[in-house]
Design a protein with these regions (language model features):
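Short, internal active-site loops enriched in acidic
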Residues: 88-90, 214-216, 303-307
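Residue-level detector of anion-binding/catalytic polar loops
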Residues: 80, 176, 357-358
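N-terminal Rossmann-like NAD(P)+-binding subdomain of aldehyde/semialdehyde dehydrogenases
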Residues: 1-135, 320, 337, 345-346, ...
Length: 359
């Protein structure tokens, strides 16, 4: 199966055979992916002229209700999304974070849009400001939708939630989106987008999808566009230095290379609730999504006096984790998202083992 690209409200296959995507569990082919031959400039123009115009016709409340309807629609397709999610190496609990978590984000933004935003096309940013003594000169800040496109470049670890957490605020703001999922798990994103398009809830041009390379997309950005990137620091810096991004002052936000830590206090000795909680949470974060969450604990800091006992407790806790096919109910941790991720983790373990012992 070749993944489709959603271009100007139609599914388009990229040219050529594309790159084969394999199951994280079995290694068997799941789909092929390519975006060769797409007219990225035309996609941007369609989003600006058709998608943006259509979205701006609605009020904040009306767009918020779209998000609610979209969430309700996706709830009806959870079974097939969960089934396909296992191919990414995700257990049912992992998929719950990704799929149900993403859908919940739609509900949250829908609720906030109706509670915190006006039922109008303009958002007033604060009260009027008197700029003269007599009150004849008054200023008022307002917020209106940008006239560009929201470019969303997403990571491999959350193919559903990663898309929906960015898509929800963009649509609520009245800005169309072009989504580029990470290739290794793009087949799950593509399925969700297919269900979104089929629902007919979003107006034409509001959402487009690129499965594969973004090609020369960045060459056609302008000052009204925004880029939201999730991935490595190196890639983010490379994209931020694109001549067009600099020349047009394109708004660019990036979430990169999370290095979250958990610190054990010197008074949290073995036998205390704090010590047990520390071990429990470190184990959870090391095994949830096979340790691939952006919020995973990657640095464990503890007093030297407690290090030996902590290592023993963590070894015992991790030894109970059942690793295997995530489709099996008795499995606690599935596979890494791709063979490439497996190789990278292996390389990093070898690097760390030069200075540290493998527990």
């Amino acid at each position: 199966m070749k993944l489709g690209n959603l271009v100007k409200d139609h599914w388009i296959d990229g040219d050529g055979d594309g790159t084969v995507l394999t199951s994280a569990v079995s290694g068997s082919p799941v789909a092929s992916i390519t975006s060769k031959g797409l007219d990225f400039a035309d996609m941007l123009q369609h989003a600006r002229t058709v998608g943006g115009s259509n979205l701006r016709r609605y009020t904040f409340h009306e767009r918020a209700l779209m998000l609610k309807a979209l969430a309700q629609c996706l709830m009806e397709h959870k079974v097939e999304l969960y089934e396909l999610s296992t191919q990414t190496g995700a257990t049912r609990q992992d998929s719950w974070i990704d799929i149900d978590g993403g859908i919940s984000t739609l509900f949250v933004f829908s609720s906030k849009g109706r509670r915190e935003m006006p039922n109008s096309h303009v958002y007033l940013d604060g009260p009027p400001e008197a700029l003269s003594r007599t009150g004849t000169f008054v200023g008022q800040h307002i917020c209106t939708p940008k006239l560009g496109v929201a470019i969303h470049i997403n990571a491999f670890n959350f193919p559903c939630w990663g898309m929906l957490e960015k898509l929800a605020p963009a649509l609520l703001a009245g800005v169309p989106a072009i989504v580029k999922p990470a290739s290794s798990t793009a087949y799950l994103t593509e399925l969700m987008v297919r269900r979104i398009l089929a629902s007919g809830i979003l107006p034409k041009g509001a959402l487009q999808l690129i499965c594969g390379s973004v090609g020369d997309l960045f060459d056609h950005l302008d000052c009204q566009d925004t880029v939201a990137f999730t991935g490595s620091k190196a890639t983010a810096e490379f994209l931020q230095q694109h001549p067009r991004v600099i020349a047009e002052s394109v708004a660019f936000t990036a979430e990169t290379d999370s290095l979250n830590s958990s610190i054990l206090g010197p008074d949290a000795v073995p036998g205390t609730p704090e010590f047990e909680l520390f071990v429990k949470e470190v184990t959870r974060e090391m095994t949830s999504k096979a340790g691939q969450k952006c919020t995973a604990i990657r640095r464990i800091i503890a007093p030297a006096s407690l290090a030996s006992e902590l290592v023993s407790a963590l070894s015992e806790s991790l030894g109970k984790v059942r690793i295997g096919n995530p489709a099996m109910k008795d499995v606690d941790m599935g596979a890494l998202a791709s063979q490439g991720q497996r190789e990278e983790v292996g390389d990093r373990v070898k690097l760390l083992s030069r200075e540290a012992d493998i527990v």
